[in-house]
A protein has these predicted regions:
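Low-complexity acidic/polar repeat-biased segments
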Residues: 1, 339-387
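Short beta-strand elements of solenoid repeat domains
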Residues: 2-4, 11-13, 20-25, 29-34, ...
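Short small/polar-residue motifs
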Residues: 10, 283-287, 324-346, 380-382
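Intrinsically disordered, low-complexity coil segments
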Residues: 138, 143-155, 357, 370-375
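Acidic glycine-/aspartate-rich tracts in secreted/extracellular proteins
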Residues: 302-306, 315-332, 358-360, 370-373
Length: 387
């Protein structure tokens, strides 16, 4: 049945079958009830309730509200600050222009934010989110569509989600599940949440974070900060002066181009500076350190340096430095006294660096030399920095 309103504010109720409801101009209330219904709100601030069935709705211009209910619904907001609740079912939601608010609900939803600043919570299910242009996701800000204070990022909810920030400075969070989260263009906050996640900051100075699970994170272009939680993670800084932190697990962290700072955290990690003048800090665990090209600093700091032995794989004499920090070491000396460090040759052809902190506790660093180009005689105080 085709049900038509006027250019005033109408209330139109559908039947138990498949209906077509037209609101025209005015602030209309359209409710489909049962059946696979079609809604056309027209101009004005409309409220569209799908009910049971697979419904299709266009809000038109104005600040519209959509309530999907049961069924696989398709809603299009148009111009205005629109509010979407997909309800149960695998829904497709289009925000259009304006600052829109999305709740996907249950089901495998697709959400397209469009232009403007969006709040998106995809809910349960394996969802796909395109945040669109604009600064999407909020942190202690007023949601333009609802007028409420919120701290919600663009969130995937439960399930294995794909989230695309596209343009703008976005806040994106995968939440639970094995998610793919892409920041796109802009200075984005990308949080994978729990699960085994793939994170890509894209262009811009991004902040990437993940919690439990085995994750892969790429900073992309820009000066990025990446921290991965528990799990054996892969981290790539790519272009820019990046800060990479492994935290828990046996991680592999690669700085990429430019001057990076890489911290292994807990676990037996592999750190690669790659191109640029990099700072590598293994922290806890028996770590493998590759400086890469240019002058790099290998840092051994505090109690972490005393707990285990790290291995430097590509130390270049006269180019790279060993920074001994917060151990009370102040000189290169073979005396074995507290506060000293020195090097000796091993029977395997490598170089062992041994030092003693201010209270006489020993620490050691292995300098691997597979090409037999280094010897303890190459080392002197000029290879060390003390702090």
């Amino acid at each position: 049945m085709i049900l038509k309103g006027t250019n005033l504010s109408d209330t139109i109720l559908g039947t138990l079958s498949d209906d077509e409801l037209w609101g025209y101009a005015g602030d209309d209330y359209l409710e489909g009830r049962d059946g696979n219904d079609m809604f056309f709100g027209g101009d004005g601030n409309d409220y569209i309730v799908g009910g049971h069935g697979d419904d299709y709705a266009e809000g038109g211009d104005g600040n519209d509200r959509f309530d999907g209910g049961l069924g696989h619904d398709t809603f299009k907001g148009g111009l205005g600050n629109d509010i979407f609740d997909g309800g149960d079912g695998s829904d497709i939601l289009y925000g259009g222009d304006g600052h829109d608010h999305f709740v996907g609900g249950r089901g495998h939803d697709k959400i397209y934010g469009g232009a403007g600043e969006e709040y998106i919570d995809a809910g349960d299910g394996d969802d796909i989110i395109y945040a669109g242009a604009g600064d999407d996701g909020f942190n202690n800000r007023i949601d333009p569509a609802t007028g409420q204070l919120t701290q919600q990022a663009v969130g995937g909810g439960a399930g294995n989600d794909r989230i695309y920030g596209e343009e703008g400075n976005d806040a994106l969070k995968g939440q639970s599940g094995n998610d793919w989260v892409y920041g796109g263009i802009g200075d984005d906050i990308v949080d994978g949440g729990d699960g085994n996640n793939f994170l890509d900051g894209g262009d811009g100075n991004d902040v990437l974070d993940s919690e439990g699970g085995t994750d892969e994170a790429h900073g992309g272009s820009g000066n990025d900060r990446i921290a991965v939680g528990g799990g054996n993670d892969l981290v790539f800084g790519d272009d820019g002066d990046d800060v990479l932190t492994g935290e828990g697990g046996d991680d592999q962290l690669s700085g990429g181009h430019d001057d990076d700072r890489i911290l292994g955290g807990d676990g037996n990690d592999t750190l690669r500076g790659d191109a640029g003048q990099d700072v590598l800090i293994g922290e806890l665990g028996s770590d493998i350190l590759w400086g890469g090209t240019e002058s790099d600093r290998f840092v051994f700091k505090g109690a972490a340096a005393l707990s285990s032995q790290d291995t430097i794989m590509d130390f270049e004499d006269g180019v790279d430095f060993l920074l001994i920090e917060k151990l009370g070491v102040s000189q290169y000396s073979s005396s074995g006294a507290s506060g000293t460090v020195y090097a000796y040759d091993t029977t395997d052809g490598d170089v062992q660096v041994v030092g003693y902190d201010s209270t006489g506790n020993a620490f050691s660093i292995l300098v691997d030399d597979p090409n037999s180009v280094l010897a303890a005689a190459n080392f002197s105080g000029s290879d060390f920095l003390f702090a």
